[in-house]
Amino acid sequence: MFEEIPTARPDTPLLDEVNSPADLRAFKKEQLPALVRELREFMLYSVGQTGGHFGAGLGVVELTVALHYLYNTPEDRIVWDVGHQAYPHKILTGRREALLNIRQENGISGFPKRDESEYDTFGVGHSSTSIGAALGMSLAARQLKTGRKAVAIIGDGAMSAGMSFEALNHAGDVKADMLVILNDNEMSISKPVGALSSYFARIWASKTYDNIREGGRKVFSGLPSALELARKAEEHMKGMVSPGMMFEELGFNYIGPIDGHDMDHLLTTIANLKDRKGPQFLHVITKKGKGFEPAEGDPIGYHAINKIEPDPKPNVDKSKLPKYCNVFGKWVCDAAEQDDKLVAITPAMKEGSDLIEFADRFPERYFDVAIAEQHAVTLAAGMACDGIKPVVAIYSTFLQRAYDQLIHDVALQNLDVLFAIDRAGLVGEDGPTHAGVYDLSYLRCIPNMVVMAPSDEDECRKMLQTGYEYKGPAAVRYPRGTGQGVDIESTLSTLKIGKSRTLRTGQSGIVICGFGRPTYDALKAANTLDATLLDMRFVKPIDEETLLTHRDAKLIVTVEENAIMGGAGSAVSELLIANNINIPTLHLGLPDQYEEHASHASMLKRVGLDADGIQKSIELKLTHL
């Protein structure tokens, strides 16, 4: 058990010999426990150097070693769900040194990524995709007769999503040759029932039991009543000591629960399941943060950590600035005090969306639906139908998963639902899988929807209240990180729908339209260029009246932290075209490509959305007028 994150690189003589799983498979089984300890210690050290997710990874060290030891990777396909648990996998697959730059600019991704390594069989970041992807690989192997094996590793939280059960149902129906491993690190499905459960897990996974069962089916195939009696006896015995009957009903052979930190048990069980025909389901119990005492005691707090600084010198001013999620957390509590019809709904984002205080103060009005974004939106729609005022707190990247429900269940019926959309824009080290850079595009095309983008924390609070009081669906998209340091009104005041504000009036004939966070960087450019700056506030409805007063402008510039295609800039151009106004325009935003992980500041500079980049782009455009 480690009590501290090592700041000096540990000695790892066994791990140093592993540059690929082929090297691992040359080890004797007796060496694996020592390798596991070295792997866990190196992972602690490396994440301490860079920051990143490590709680889930610490919990699957033994499982990762067992899988790469027994399967012929990369020929056999191992698919990790979400990817938070894949750090040990990266270390064992030739990226040990690269882990020291994980999530850094030009470093490796924090998630499995197909173009990074042949061992990363499926790119992930969002949850609950592993079973469906592994099933697809299993069926491809069947059709192409490659003999490849497919394994999906999924956490108990991700198992709550409907997509997981859709894939399980299909896999059972087509009798796919695949193994699904449930990494249960919260014991949210069921606790193992002591020694009896462990004993039967070993028996059910054994080839002897499998042969007896198949032989019995053949012998009694002509005696339906006897076969049915045997099946029921097996079900009743499993049901006494096993939580897995649900998976059996879906067509899987369920094994477990077993101790995910018992290497001998893992090796024996997985080896027995590896060559079985048909869908297999292995339930392993692990400890999130295993081997690191603080993480075992606080698995949520240690889900991810920041870089360990040897001599930390915090920026005092920056630390005092509220994060946008904190602005939301304060507003939703204040609004709930004033209106007992307000409820908060979130798909497993209680901490990230800052709903901890709300859940404590208003437990009967707080609904965490787990990783079920589609259900979260339709649940809100149902509540709104009968007089409740739901606030859906959700990350921009995850709202994409509920787009049909957003249109069909909420907007089409013009229901009073407020979407508090966090992590809008670029999200730094989490990279393209978590970037919220499409919401302005996919929201503004939906009828009845009001779409707002705050430039600072006070605007964010006002927009949340505006959206809450609006009769119909409304969305406020706000970024990750801290605000601008402006004073925040304590009252629950609102804004006029579709009305911008002028932050600066210039004389150069340049009009800059800022949407959301980039507005303050645009202000710096506006001061240099003597440009007029509009904080547009509303992407939909756009402030037509104000924009049309600038029909004689030399250049209209739009700035947004969203995809340029179909975004806020497109809304401005559409307005100008509809009114036969021929003014040169410049749309600054995110190009038609995925932006790789880096610090947020580096990403803004890369795409030209920092103050200097905005100014240079405008100056370049002026040279072509």
From Swiss-Prot:
Obligatory cofactor(s): Mg(2+); thiamine diphosphate
Keyword Magnesium: yes
GO molecular function: 1-deoxy-D-xylulose-5-phosphate synthase activity; magnesium ion binding; thiamine pyrophosphate binding
Keywords, comma-separated and alphabetical: Isoprene biosynthesis, Magnesium, Metal-binding, Thiamine biosynthesis, Thiamine pyrophosphate, Transferase
Source organism, top-level taxon: Bacteria
Pathway entry: Metabolic intermediate biosynthesis; 1-deoxy-D-xylulose 5-phosphate biosynthesis; 1-deoxy-D-xylulose 5-phosphate from D-glyceraldehyde 3-phosphate and pyruvate: step 1/1
Pfam families according to UniProt: DXP_synthase_N, Transket_pyr, Transketolase_C
Record's catalysed reaction(s): D-glyceraldehyde 3-phosphate + pyruvate + H(+) = 1-deoxy-D-xylulose 5-phosphate + CO2
Positions of disulphide bridges: none
InterPro entries registered for this protein in UniProt: Dxylulose-5-P_synthase, THDP-binding, Transketo_C/PFOR_II, Transketolase-like_Pyr-bd, Transketolase_BS, Transketolase_C
Cofactor note: Binds 1 Mg(2+) ion per subunit. Binds 1 thiamine pyrophosphate per subunit.
A GO BP annotation: isopentenyl diphosphate biosynthetic process, methylerythritol 4-phosphate pathway
Enzyme class: transferase
The EC number(s) this enzyme carries: 2.2.1.7
GO CC, alphabetical: cytosol
Residues reported to bind Mg(2+): 156, 185
Family: Belongs to the transketolase family. DXPS subfamily.
Record's function text: Catalyzes the acyloin condensation reaction between C atoms 2 and 3 of pyruvate and glyceraldehyde 3-phosphate to yield 1-deoxy-D-xylulose-5-phosphate (DXP).
Protein name per Swiss-Prot or TrEMBL: 1-deoxy-D-xylulose-5-phosphate synthase
